[in-house]
C-alpha cells in the first residue's frame, strides 16, 4: 500500500501494536528503574545497613555523575548510526548491562559496604542513561503528527504505569513471598531479608529486559537526521540548544520540579504507611498500587481531556487535584480520629496519584514539540541532545528527591529498627509525603504557565519544517 502524502512527509499514523510496543519500553524501564527509585532507599536503610544521610549523599553524587554522563550519551547517539537503529539499538546495547547492575544493587553479599553500593548504583545509573536518552529520542523519530504523538504518549504512560503498578503493589508481595521468615520486624513491616529482595529484583529486571526486546522489535525510526547533519553534532550543542530554545528551558525546569516531587513522595511512601499509619504488608501493597491504578482510567482519556480544556488547563487542573490528595493524606495522619480510617488514605492516595500521573505523564508529549521547535529555528533535529538535556534535569530533580528524604529522616532522628517513631520523626515523614511535594507542585504550576507552544503553533511549525524537506 502506498504512503499518503502526509506519511511521506513524516506525519505517520502508527498501528496499535507499534504504539503498545513503544510503550513497552517505558514499562520495562519502570520495572527496573522505578523499583530502584521507590525501594532502594528502604533497602539501603533497612536491609543493607546504610545510614540514611550516607545514602542521601550517595544519591547526590550519582546525580552529579549523570550531569556529566548524560550529554556525552546524547551527543554520542545523535552522532552515530548503529546498524540496529539510531536510537532503538540502545534498548538492547544498554538494556543488558542495565539489567545486570540493577540486580546487583539489591544483592546483600557486601552488606554495609559503601564502595559496593557506589559501584553498583553508579553503574546502574549510567546504563539507565544509555537506555533512557535514546528511548526518549525514539519518540520524536516515530512521527511528526501532534495528534499521533498525544495518542502515543498516552499509550506509553498507560504502559509505564502498568509497570509502576507491578512495582508498587507487586514488590511488597514478592519480597514477602521470597522471605525466609526470619527477617520480619513486627507484623506490619516489610521483610528485611536480603535474599528476598535480591530474588525480587532478579525477577523484575529479567521481565523488564524482555519488554525492552519487545519494544525494539515493534519500533521503526522514520524522522531522523541525515548523515551530513550527524557528523556535526558535538557535546557543546547541548548548552547551545538550551540557551536558544525557550520552550526547552521551560520544559527542563518543569522536569526538575516534577521529578523532585515524585522522587520525594515515592521514596517516603513506604515510610508513611509503615511508621505513620502502621499498616500491614497488604495495606502497603494497596496504597503503593493506588499510585499507578489511576493511569488505567485517566491516561486513555488524556487526548479527549486535552481537546476539551486545552493543554495548559489540563496541567493546572490535575496539579491542583494532586495537591488536594496530599492535603488529605496529611490530615489523616495528624487527626487521631482518622488514623484508623484506612479507606480515606486509599481515596486520598488515588486522588493524589491521578493528578500526578496525568500531569507528569503528559509532559513527555512536550519533548517532541521542543525538538521540532529547535529544528524549526536551527534546521537541525538533535533529538538525542534534547533528550539528554531533559535527562539531566529530571535526574537533577531525582537528585533533590533522593537527597531530601535521607537528610530529613536523619535530621528528625528516624530509627529503622524501631516500629514506633518519635512524633518528630513521624512529622518529618509527613513533610516528605505531603508538604514538600505540594510546594513543588505549586512551583511546577507556575513554570508550565510559561510554556508557549500550543497545538496550533506546533502544526504550523511541523508543516514549515516539512515544506523545506
Where are these regions (language model features)?
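Membrane-embedded alpha-helical bundles of multi-pass transporters/translocases
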Residues: 2-469
Amino acid at each position: 500500500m502506498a504512503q499518503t502524502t502526509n506519511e511521506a512527509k513524516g506525519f505517520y499514523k502508527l498501528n496499535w501494536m507499534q504504539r503498545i510496543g513503544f510503550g513497552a519500553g517505558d514499562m520495562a524501564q519502570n520495572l527496573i528503574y522505578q523499583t530502584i527509585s521507590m525501594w532502594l532507599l528502604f533497602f539501603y536503610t533497612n536491609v543493607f545497613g546504610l545510614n540514611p544521610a550516607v545514602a542521601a549523599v550517595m544519591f547526590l553524587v550519582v546525580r552529579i555523575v549523570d550531569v556529566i554522563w548524560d550529554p556525552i550519551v546524547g551527543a554520542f547517539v545523535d552522532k552515530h548510526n548503529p546498524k540496529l537503529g539510531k536510537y532503538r539499538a540502545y534498548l538492547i546495547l544498554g538494556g543488558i548491562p542495565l539489567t545486570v547492575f540493577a540486580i546487583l544493587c539489591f544483592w546483600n553479599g557486601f552488606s554495609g559496604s559503601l564502595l559496593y553500593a557506589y559501584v553498583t548504583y553508579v553503574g546502574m545509573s549510567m546504563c539507565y542513561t544509555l537506555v533512557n536518552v535514546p528511548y526518549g529520542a525514539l519518540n520524536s523519530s516515530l512521527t511528526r503528527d501532534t495528534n499521533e504523538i498525544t495518542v502515543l504518549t498516552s499509550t506509553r504512560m498507560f504502559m509505564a504505569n502498568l509497570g509502576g503498578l507491578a512495582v508498587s503493589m507487586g514488590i511488597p508481595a514478592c519480597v514477602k513471598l521470597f522471605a525466609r521468615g526470619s527477617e520480619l520486624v513486627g507484623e506490619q513491616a516489610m521483610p528485611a531479608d536480603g535474599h528476598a529482595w535480591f530474588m525480587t529484583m532478579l525477577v523484575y529486571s529479567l521481565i523488564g529486559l524482555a519488554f525492552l526486546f519487545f519494544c525494539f522489535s515493534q519500533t521503526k525510526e522514520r524522522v531522523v537526521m541525515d548523515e551530513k547533519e550527524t557528523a556535526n553534532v558535538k557535546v557543546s550543542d547541548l548548552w547551545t540548544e538550551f540557551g536558544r530554545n525557550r520552550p526547552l528551558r521551560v520544559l527542563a525546569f518543569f522536569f526538575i520540579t516534577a521529578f523532585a516531587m515524585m522522587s520525594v513522595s515515592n521514596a517516603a511512601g513506604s515510610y508513611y504507611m509503615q511508621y505513620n499509619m502502621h499498616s500491614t504488608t497488604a495495606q502497603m501493597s494497596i496504597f503503593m498500587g493506588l499510585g499507578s491504578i489511576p493511569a488505567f482510567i485517566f491516561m486513555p482519556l488524556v487526548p479527549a481531556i486535552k481537546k476539551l480544556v486545552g493543554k495548559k488547563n489540563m496541567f493546572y487542573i490535575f496539579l491542583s487535584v494532586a495537591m488536594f490528595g496530599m492535603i488529605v493524606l496529611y490530615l489523616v495522619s495528624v487527626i487521631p480520629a482518622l488514623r484508623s480510617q484506612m479507606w480515606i488514605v486509599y481515596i486520598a492516595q488515588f486522588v493524589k496519584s491521578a493528578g500526578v500521573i496525568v500531569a507528569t505523564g503528559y509532559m513527555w508529549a512536550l519533548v517532541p514539540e521542543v525538538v521540532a521547535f529547535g529544528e524549526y529555528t536551527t534546521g537541525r533535529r538533535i533529538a538525542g541532545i534534547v533528550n539528554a538535556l531533559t535527562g539531566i534535569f529530571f535526574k537533577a530533580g531525582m537528585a533533590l528527591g533522593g537527597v531530601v528524604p535521607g537528610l530529613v529522616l536523619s535530621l528528625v532522628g528516624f530509627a529503622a529498627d524501631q516500629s514506633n517513631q518519635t512524633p518528630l520523626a513521624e512529622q518529618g515523614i509527613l513533610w516528605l509525603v505531603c508538604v514538600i511535594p505540594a510546594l513543588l507542585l505549586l512551583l511546577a504550576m507556575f513554570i508550565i504557565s510559561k510554556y508557549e507552544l500550543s497545538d496550533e503553533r506546533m502544526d504550523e511549525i511541523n508543516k514549515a519544517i516539512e515544506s523545506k524537506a
